[in-house]
Amino acid sequence: MRIGRSFGSCSAEGALLALLVIALIAATAAADDFAYGRRLYLDKAQCSYCHGWAADGAGETQSNGGAANLRQSFLNREQLIEVIMCGRPATPMPHYDEAAYTDNRCYGMTEAELGTSVPALPPGATLQKREVEAIADYLLAKFIGRGAVTREECEEVFGTGGRACSQYPAKP
């Protein structure tokens, strides 16, 4: 009888340990995905050039200007993916899908229908769908619908106590 109870106890402990391991693996994978999306946003796709490091539309002074403030956006994941893949016609927002507008995958329109309004393809920066998904997930986790930039967010990027971050308010 005691053996059965001990075995039952081990099973419960084993199940708890297995759940803990799964949670740890999931948390590590989420952190890796977040870092991957961030690298793509900042470096490969260079979204920050126009949208800014904090996705607030305050990009580099040399950019075309007028980039969307993604912090005020309420686009869902699918909408973000479409905008990144397809760009925004008649705006400086480029498309990152090499085959965009060759068929109706982008907003149900083709290049023939758009004429000169087809968004530009950024030189050397086409993205795979999984890369676009990683950027969308990063934006949703960090910026979409978040309101004003905070000092804490700035310090995550530029380090604690930096002069550049003093212009932002602390989190309430």
Give the residues covered by each predicted segment.
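Low-complexity, intrinsically disordered segments with a bias for serine/threonine
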Residues: C10-A15, L121
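Bacterial N-terminal signal peptides
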Residues: G14-A26
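Gly/Gly-Pro-rich "capping" loops immediately C-terminal to redox-active cysteine motifs
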Residues: A54-S117
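Flexible coil segments in periplasmic/lumen-exposed cytochrome c-class electron-transfer proteins
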Residues: D32-A35, D43-A45, W53, P94-P172
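Mature N-terminal segment immediately following signal peptide/propeptide cleavage
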Residues: R39
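N-terminal secretory signal peptides that target proteins for export/translocation
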Residues: M1-S11
